[in-house]
Amino acid sequence: ILEEVFGPILGKLLGIAYAWFFITLAALNLQDLCDFAKITVMTETPRLVLALLCVLVAVYAVRHGLKVVTQYGTLFTFVEFAIVLVTIILLSNQMDFQNFLPLFAQPVKNYLHGTHLILTVPFGELVVFLMCAPCVRLSSKDATKYWFGGAAMGMVVLLSVQLRDISILGDTISMFTLPGLVVLRLVNLGQTLSRMEILFAAALMMLLYFKISVLCYASTIT
């Protein structure tokens, strides 16, 4: 498509740029996954072993097509949503809404900078799904609905997590590398829900692996 629209030379250059973007983004997410696993659940496992295992499984999934890559994505997405909702309910008695005050105390440029980062990093990466569009049999109306619906769901979850963490940790949130895990460790209902952060960590690592697989798939068809 790029070559048909922009010509053979410029189209190839844009294709290379897209492939480089997807590969670089996959590498950054792979680093995040390995760092997260080392900090939380696999502290004794060498980082190289974690990276190799993730890459091999991602390549295996990509080799068998987009359907294999996305089959488990929905399951772990809803698991993550459920964990966020349950923790908000269980930790509601520990939330202090005074932690949100004072409102709008920062300069306007700080809010603009933060908004730019959010729109660029998490939501700017949605461009990768354009590479998967030819594999999805949907009308343009349905595709638009699912596209913006998925983005809206992601925005709601990210906002809910941030509001939950700030309301509980307050100013101390800047002291923690993984404030979400710190908050989840506060959930303690006897021995039934005393280690919910392990479930959260496992689901988050699977979602990162899903993201890496999609990026690898996009880079191979670019």
Where are the language model's segments positioned?
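Membrane-interface interhelical connector segments
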Residues: 168-197
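Membrane-interface helix termini and inter-helical loops of multi-pass transporters
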Residues: 32-42, 95-109
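Membrane helical hairpin/interfacial module
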Residues: 1-47, 53-56
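Hydrophobic, membrane-embedded alpha-helices of multi-pass small-molecule transporters
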Residues: 18-22, 26, 50-55, 63, ...
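Membrane-interface helix-boundary motifs at transmembrane edges
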Residues: 2-6, 66-72, 135-147, 222
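C-terminal hydrophobic structural anchor segments
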Residues: 213-222
